[in-house]
Amino acid sequence: MSKAPSVVLAGGGTAGHINPMLAIAREIRRIEPEANILTLGTKDKMEAQLVPEAGFDIEFIPRVAFPRSLSLNALTFFPRFAKAISQTRKILKDANADVVVGVGGYVCPPAYLAAFFSRIPVVIHEANAKPGLANKLGGPLAKFVGVAFSNTPFPRAKLVGMPMKDEIAHLNRRAARAQARHTLGLDPDKPVLIVTGGSLGAQSLNNAVAENITNFKDWGFQVLHITGKGKAIVDDSGEPVTAPNYRQIEFSHGMQDVYAAADLLIVRAGAATVSEVAAVGVPAIFVPLPFGNGEQSLNARSLVMAEAALLIEDKKMTGAWFAREIPSLMADAQKLKEMGRRAYKLGIRDAAHAMAEATLKVVK
């Protein structure tokens, strides 16, 4: 490579797009320390904070959503979209971009087309088992497409896994368990069930846990309940509920601690979560979102079919189901161990490296 490569990464809107993008960026920087790395995002989404915090530059382009019905927005879509493409072409020119890497989200369609019109190669990573619209549109333009799941229907795609933080990809759960439980305020010697619906929480999970709080003292294990911001379970006086063998927090800053501490995890089935569960080998029960296009159930399919995880529909995640199923599963240490072993066997831990190498190969 005669000069330091200039890489522009596009993605954002949700952590499911931002975290893989940052993992790829970090690995490119590790392989090519002199690489010029720029990201594209929108001002009003979380990438505006998370990308600079991670040490990368970001340029903003307008958020132009594809119209799904006839409206004023639909009538003005094409001029707004054309403007976003034009602005992105200028950014790519100013950055002397050698390649554009897209991970999905609103910024990707104008980025893909700007790259195409500027004769800059495109690399794509698709996180979900059911591809998003942005990446489906960009796929025919891409020199390389990496996917996180083997059942992703994407032409010419290569299975690479989900780019993730090194702290998670290379987590040794057994070695980290005691410290992780201490960090999370848990008894290091008692089995741990962790229930989390992510940063925003999940009502079905929160309700199922809340209905069983008084039972936990008799079940022989402790429960860490990550409720989501503003979703604490409160008593009649408005104070967060406390009970034997039960601890609740609104969020955790380090999912690696959650994965290390848990003997069993009850969680949504986002692409990153499913991939991380497999990478670290933690037994899990997935409760897919009850809306959307069904991608969360598809994300979890390979682990569930391999008996590495369980899946329950959101509407069936009730307090009664929880009380009927969870105590016996938590008491079956051998089954949990086997679930974790099978999950780990399916995990892919070098996705960031695979995507970084594919990106730099396109530049050469």
Regions found by a protein language model. Name each.
Residues 348-364:
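C-terminal alpha-helical cap of glycosyltransferases
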Residues 335-349:
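A short, well-ordered alpha-helix in the C-terminal region of glycosyltransferases
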Residues 57, 116-178, 183:
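Active-site-proximal region of nucleotide-activated glycan assembly enzymes
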Residues 118, 260-262, 278-287, 306:
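Conserved donor-binding/catalytic loop of nucleotide-activated donor transferases
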Residues 87-100, 108-123, 136-141:
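Glycosyltransferases and closely related glycan-assembly transferases
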Residues 45-46, 50, 54, 176-267, ...:
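Donor-nucleotide binding loops and adjacent catalytic segments primarily
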Residues 4-12, 34-80, 85, 313-315:
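Conserved nucleotide-sugar phosphate-binding/catalytic loop shared by glycosyltransferases and other
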Residues 17-28:
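Short amphipathic alpha-helix
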